Amino acid sequence: MKTPRLPIAIQQAVMRRLRENLAQANLKLDRHYPEPKLVYTQRGTSAGTAWLESYEIRLNPVLLLENIDTFIAEVVPHELAHLLVWKHFGRKAPHGKEWKWMMESVLGVPARRTHQFALQSVRRNTFPYHCQCQQHQLTVRRHNRVVRGEAVYRCVHCGEPLVAG
């Protein structure tokens, strides 16, 4: 799928939110953390990722276009919080107590680990599997691991191995 072009107004809104959150964090933490690089190359069902060593935030342009206001209000500070935790505390659990504190106490945003965006436009083909209690849909990657004998996936409810079909 081709990456969509983001209107400049949306890119500016994202950058404005990033800068506001960063200024707020620098003020509350009495630091001068630099502005991270912002790119729109995230693919798949992830809304964004924070790359620590390159100090970069990658955002999903498809999900951004489909959920502009919520995306900017939630995903941008979420990913920035990962970078700020890394700068402030060192390497910590991705959604641990330091990240939660950074989100809620420093940035003033509810600490949610996952987004609730509709994924139809970014979801790839899935394969039907089942266990004793329900149907499951495995991604292409997981399905291929099962086919190659590299993985066995189990139902989180009944614990039974998932079977194709």
Curated annotation (Swiss-Prot):
* Highest taxon listed in the record's lineage: Bacteria
Catalytic residues?
E79
Query: Which PROSITE patterns does this UniProt record tie to the protein?
Result: ZINC_PROTEASE
> Which GO molecular function terms does the record list?
zinc ion binding
Q: Could you tell me which residue ranges the SprT-like domain spans?
A: 22-163
Family in the record:
Belongs to the SprT family.
Write down the NCBIfam families for this protein, in alphabetical order: PRK04860.1 (NF003421)
Please name the PANTHER family in this protein's record. Answer: PROTEIN SPRT
Q: What is this protein's record name?
A: Protein SprT
Q: Which organism is it from?
A: Salmonella typhimurium (strain LT2 / SGSC1412 / ATCC 700720)
- State the encoding gene: sprT
